[in-house]
Amino acid sequence: MIGAFRIVGYVIASADGRIADASGHPASLKLDADHRFFAAGLNHVDAVVHGRHSHEGEPDSVRRRRLILTRRVASLAPDPENSMARLWNPAGASFEEACAALGLSSGTVAILGGPLVYTLFLKRGYDNFHLSRAVNVRIPDGLPVFIREAYGGEPEAALAASGLTPGPTLWLDDEVSVTDWERAG
């Protein structure tokens, strides 16, 4: 928890731990079973957090409160393209201040990526992290889930090092598995 906020991560990674190809495109990771799991999970969150290149792409996305991480603002600013969103620079405003700008003082916040965003919240503390794997997809030279300079190795190693423990792996279909990592206590 960060203050009164429950922090939940969602990612689908390739079998080799990548979330997109070198150009930032995750097309090979757009799989129906994971999409349904992800969309169902987002129905239970109060806000989402992502970088400027990440987005959940759901029909109701514009109605969801969101923080978009960027260095283009000093602290917080309205998103000129979405009245439900705020641009947030963590160097200039705390997470609690950013959530307050969305009208939230508590609740569940979903972290949607990319690597800098996932790593920021790995340092701050996830309560739960849903790690989906596209077991038949490999993306050589792709983008990792977490910044490797800070948290080398596979996403599982980074999650374990941050104090999360894996639950059982659930198979969504023959292409996608998901493991829920949780903080004890």
Language-model features: where?
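Enzymes that bind and transform nitrogen-containing heteroaromatic metabolites
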Residues: 1-185
